[in-house]
Swiss-Prot record:
Heme c binds at C35. It comes from the Eukaryota. Its main location: plastid. This is Cytochrome b6. Belongs to the cytochrome b family. PetB subfamily. NCBIfam families: PRK03735.1 (NF002990). The lineage of its organism: Eukaryota, Viridiplantae, Chlorophyta, core chlorophytes, Chlorophyceae. One of its GO terms (molecular function) is metal ion binding.
Length: 215
């Protein structure tokens, strides 16, 4: 085992990277509330893992979506547990994200020179809410259907561009298969990719600038 480690160490200098990570200075004012962002990140990882597991059985069609969710809950081994963890972790992620935003705002973590970190965090907050909106529709039950119909109908009040924007979201005039396909694509590919990119940028900026000082 040591030979394998030495092989990687010689080429990648793993030890120096580990030393840099573990020796990072942590200010004395940091408390448990500074862990809220990390908890949100953990919830995101749980969402990715459980969501990926469900994609093996979920069918994004208006005719089969609801039945496939029922199949996951009743027939797939531990499917009920995986979907329940996905749902609970989603609620926890939203809650921790909100608390994290409040903590950063109340402690002034958005001020110079951390404006970019704050902006990337706000974008991720929007992505998190969008996860909830798109994921809510995927079972394609009565609640999901009418939620999509209401949410996608909101932009219609915008002058000039409202109508085309609604059609873009729905994939047509009414809510149907094209809408479900769009929401499934957003929920399983577009939003996770955007969130991962902005998370990486967020962490790199925190790493570079350090944790903000006390008020």
């Amino acid at each position: 085992m040591s030979k394998v480690y030495d092989w990687f160490e010689e080429r990648l200098e793993i030890q120096s990277i580990a030393d840099d990570i573990t020796s990072k200075y942590v200010p004395p004012h940091v408390n448990i509330f500074y862990c809220l962002g990390g908890i949100t990140f953990t919830c995101f990882l749980v969402q990715v893992a459980t969501g990926f597991a469900m994609t093996f059985y979920y069918r994004p069609t208006v005719a089969e979506a609801f039945a496939s969710v029922q199949y996951i809950m009743t027939e797939v081994n531990f499917g009920w547990l995986i979907r329940s963890i996905h749902r609970w972790s989603a609620s926890m992620m939203v809650l921790m994200m909100i608390l994290h935003v409040f903590r950063v705002y109340l402690t002034g973590g958005f001020k110079k020179p951390r404006e970019s970190t704050w902006i990337s965090g706000v974008i991720m907050a929007v992505c998190t809410v969008s996860f909830g909106v798109t994921g809510y529709s995927l079972p394609w039950d009565q609640i999901g259907y009418w939620a999509v119909k209401i949410v996608t109908g909101v932009p219609e009040a915008i002058p000039v561009v409202g109508g085309p924007l609604v059609e873009l979201l729905r994939g047509g005039v009414g809510v149907g298969q094209a809408t479900l396909t769009r929401f499934y694509s957003l929920h399983t590919f577009v939003l996770p990719l955007l969130t991962a990119v902005f998370m990486l940028a967020h962490f790199l900026m925190i790493r570079k600038q350090g944790i903000s000082g006390p008020l």
